[in-house]
Design a protein with these regions (language model features):
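Conserved acidic, metal-coordinating active-site core of Asp-based
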Residues: 124-208, 214-222
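Asp-based, Mg2+/Mn2+-dependent phosphohydrolase catalytic module
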Residues: 222, 226-242
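Phosphate- and divalent-cation-binding pockets in alpha/beta enzyme and binding domains
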Residues: 70-73, 194, 218-219, 236
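Short loop/turn segments at strand-loop or loop-helix junctions that form parts
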Residues: 9-21, 88-90, 96-98, 140, ...
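Active-site phosphate-binding/coordination module
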Residues: 41-126
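Active-site neighborhood of HAD-like aspartate-dependent phosphohydrolases
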Residues: 2-60
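Short, polar loop motifs at secondary-structure junctions
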Residues: 211-215, 230-233
């Protein structure tokens, strides 16, 4: 049966999360969860995933900030029914584990046109982060730069460094901050563009977008229907009167 429904599915904090964020997570969602750490689904999240995964009409497309290695750590990435995924905030689209060549070329050209390349931005980050042992700096496969604070890092210390890092932002980049992580990404790394690309490629009869954060909302707006978890950050967009 033809998969004429596309579900663009954000992963972290939508389909699963760490125990620290939700103690009700009981179903391992990542390889590392089997060892007692990592991410888990609640019973409700597991049932929702099964609902779509078991339907022959639905093509699930994980739409995530995770890099390739982190995506491979998820258990759903091993499903033979999930062949396509959007990774690195849309920096890469994979089909059966192989990068989509047309999209890869498009992204490569966008990076070449940056006035401030990732390599130079990394140098600027290093100058500010190297003297702070409670933070770790990541060059995420040349796609973007992330700084993560240790779990025991005081909030005031975290906020202070992140405020300094915000001054490095230029018109070519935007800030993405999530819990203990601070990232600077080029504006073209946007899930909505990859979603639009795949909708045009597959020409589905129905599209669904599922996400929890404000940064997910633009890609969800490309879809016919949107699914939002309870108590999601996205709820702040709506002023609902009881």
């Amino acid at each position: 049966m033809m998969q004429n429904i596309l579900l663009f599915l954000d992963l972290d904090d939508t389909l699963f999360q760490t125990k620290r964020k939700n103690q009700n997570g009981v179903i391992p969602a990542t390889q590392s969860a089997k060892a007692g750490r990592g991410s888990y689904m609640t019973e409700a999240q597991g049932l929702l995933f099964e609902l779509f995964h078991d339907s022959e009409k639905v093509k699930i497309i994980p739409t995530t900030a995770r890099d390739f290695r982190q995506y491979q750590n998820t258990l759903l990435s091993q499903s033979p029914r999930i062949e396509t995924a959007i990774l690195y905030f849309a920096g890469m689209i994979i089909e059966k584990g192989i990068p989509d060549k047309q999209w890869q070329q498009h992204i490569h050209q966008a990076y070449q046109q940056l006035n401030l390349p990732i390599s130079q931005l990394l140098t600027q980050f290093e100058q500010r982060v190297d003297n702070h042992p409670q933070f770790t700096l990541y060059n995420v496969d040349e796609y973007y730069i992330t700084v993560k604070a240790e779990t025991d890092c005081p909030k005031a210390t975290q906020d202070g460094l992140f405020s300094q890092l915000k001054t490095l932002k230029t018109s070519e980049y935007f800030v993405h901050q999530n819990d203990r992580a601070f990232s600077l990404l080029p504006h073209f790394l946007d899930k909505r563009y990859a979603v639009k690309y795949l909708i045009e490629k597959y020409q589905p009869e129905l599209t669904l977008g599922m996400g929890d954060s404000l940064t997910d909302w633009p890609f969800m707006q490309q879809c016919d229907f949107r699914i939002i978890p309870k108590e999601a950050q996205i709820e702040s967009l709506f002023k609902i009167i009881d």
